[in-house]
């Protein structure tokens, strides 16, 4: 009832990192089934944090969060972080936003949309410094990505469950309907979701 658009199926995982891995694997599965086996490239962003498992660490844009263990580098493309503070050469946020959108579209054209599996983005880059992107940035990215028939993954591990005033920020705050939405943490109010069901006989004895 609360998920954006027609997102009406849930796949449970063990945490946010594995949720990201699962989302990317589902993209691979869908493309392979459709015969689009060349669509393997992933676009992400600098300063983004998507997790610590193999694939989620690979699409994370924070080098200090990447351990000495191997990660996947081939086929992962990083765009600039949507933080105006890092790029003072732009006089205003609107010009900076235009630059970021152009960068995204140029990267898609460079790689070839027929080769791109997904674009993954946090609506607000939390671990990267609580980076709030320029106004309309998320919506404009979504427009570009959908124009080129690329899967849009919204990583709402941090922003979902009313962190920004709504169950999910993608639709109500940023006006986008992602193809896949990832959430964790807030779904259990921060409690670790674990369960054991012992036999009543154990208690009786």
Protein language model regions, located:
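PLP-dependent aspartate aminotransferase-fold enzymes
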Residues: 2-117
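Single conserved hydrophobic/aromatic residue that forms the stacking wall/gate
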Residues: 195-205
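Generic enzyme active-site microenvironment
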Residues: 23, 120, 153-154, 177, ...
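Acidic-glycine-rich active-site phosphate/pyrophosphate-binding loop
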Residues: 1, 170, 197
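Short acidic, glycine-rich surface-loop motifs adjacent to enzyme active sites
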Residues: 114-129
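Conserved active-site segment immediately N-terminal to the catalytic lysine
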Residues: 169-185
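Active-site nucleophile and cofactor-binding loops and adjacent substrate-binding regions
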Residues: 10-20, 158, 182-188
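Catalytic PLP-binding core of fold-type I/II PLP enzymes
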Residues: 131-165
């Amino acid at each position: 009832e609360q998920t954006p658009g027609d997102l009406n199926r849930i796949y449970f995982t063990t945490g946010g990192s594995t949720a990201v891995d699962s989302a990317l694997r589902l993209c691979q599965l869908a493309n392979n089934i459709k015969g689009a086996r060349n669509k393997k490239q992933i676009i992400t962003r600098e300063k983004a944090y998507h997790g610590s498992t193999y694939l989620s660490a690979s699409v994370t844009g924070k080098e200090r969060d990447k351990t000495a263990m191997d990660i996947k580098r081939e086929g992962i493309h990083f765009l600039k972080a949507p933080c105006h503070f890092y790029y003072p050469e732009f006089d205003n946020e609107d010009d900076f936003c235009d630059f970021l959108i152009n960068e995204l579209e140029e990267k898609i054209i460079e790689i070839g949309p027929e080769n791109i599996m997904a674009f993954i983005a946090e609506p607000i880059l939390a671990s990267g410094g609580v980076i709030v992107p320029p106004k309309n940035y998320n919506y404009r990215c979504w427009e570009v990505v959908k124009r080129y028939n690329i899967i849009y993954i919204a990583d709402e591990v941090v922003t979902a469950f009313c962190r920004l005033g709504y169950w999910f920020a993608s639709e109500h705050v940023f006006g986008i309907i992602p193809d896949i939405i990832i959430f964790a943490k807030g779904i259990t109010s921060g409690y670790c979701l674990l369960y054991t069901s012992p036999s009543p006989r154990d208690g009786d004895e």
